[in-house]
Regions:
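N-terminal pre-domain/capping segments
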Residues: 1-103, 127, 131, 158
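Acidic/histidine-rich catalytic cores of soluble enzymes
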Residues: 9-11, 37, 71, 121-227
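Acidic-and-aromatic substrate-binding clefts and catalytic sites of carbohydrate-active enzymes
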Residues: 12-20, 41-53, 76-87, 110-117, ...
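Generic structural signal for well-ordered alpha-helices
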Residues: 23-30, 51-59, 91-95, 116-123, ...
């Protein structure tokens, strides 16, 4: 298993557009801690970045022996905003970004039925460049619940379109995330995200879900007990 460190760890929780650490510094940390890759997001480089900056970012990773495991090419996608699915309407710049970084996996966002056809078209365009598309298990999206996620995967029906398994978001929505769900998702899993939290109605953080309304929780370190039971995962 190859481990990748998301540049999310170097963003402010309340603002995914602001990096707290330079890419060079973060890459050095990843190497020191035994990671094999970085998961790139627009807080470091994205479609808004110049070609020179993207190329330089790729060089910095390569110089440290790090791969780019996945690319999230803009801000609306990780923010899960209404603008998130717009990338599917013009996937070309995102494919260019991934190609320059030597990455074959691109994260996308889907929030309504109309996005399904655009996902098919984008997947077909990505396939021509040997790039895969994936959607994260995420609140307020077509991938909020397990059954609906599988329905959408079958509706898109492209071999290069898959899933980013993420148990914390599934738990926020009241869904199962254990071995049974993993077995159902297994043919479609392209990537795995792991983060930890403890559900708490009075918690410091709150996220809106379609399934359960607002859900309170506390963020905790990945190794801390009392949150997501990662052992069976």
């Amino acid at each position: 298993m190859k481990l990748s460190l998301s540049v999310r760890v170097a963003e402010k929780f309340s603002s995914k557009r602001e990096a707290n650490m330079a890419l060079t510094e973060l890459a050095d940390v990843a190497v020191e801690e035994g990671f094999h890759a970085l998961c790139m997001r627009a807080s470091q480089v994205g479609i808004q970045s110049s070609a020179e900056d993207v190329t330089e970012a790729g060089r910095r990773l390569e110089a440290r022996g790090l791969a780019c495991s996945m690319v999230t090419g803009d801000f609306p996608i990780p923010e899960n905003s209404e603008e998130g699915p717009q990338a599917l309407r013009n996937i070309g710049p995102y494919l260019d970004l991934a190609s320059t970084l030597g990455c074959n996996l691109l994260r996308i966002c889907m929030k309504e039925e109309a996005d399904i056809e655009w996902a098919r078209r984008s997947a077909d365009e990505a396939a021509e460049r040997k790039i895969r598309l994936a959607h994260q298990c995420h609140t307020r999206s077509l991938f909020e619940l397990v059954d609906r996620s599988l329905e959408v995967l079958h509706q898109v029906n492209r071999p290069n379109f898959g899933l980013i398994y993420e148990p914390a978001n599934l738990e926020l929505c009241g869904g199962d995330f254990g071995p049974e769900t993993i077995a159902r998702f297994a043919p479609h899993i392209f990537n795995v995200y792991l983060q930890n939290h403890r559900l708490n109605p009075q918690g410091a953080s709150t996220l809106e879900t379609w399934a359960r309304g607002n859900v309170g929780f506390d963020q905790i370190p990945i190794w801390e007990a009392g949150g997501i039971d990662l052992e069976p995962v």
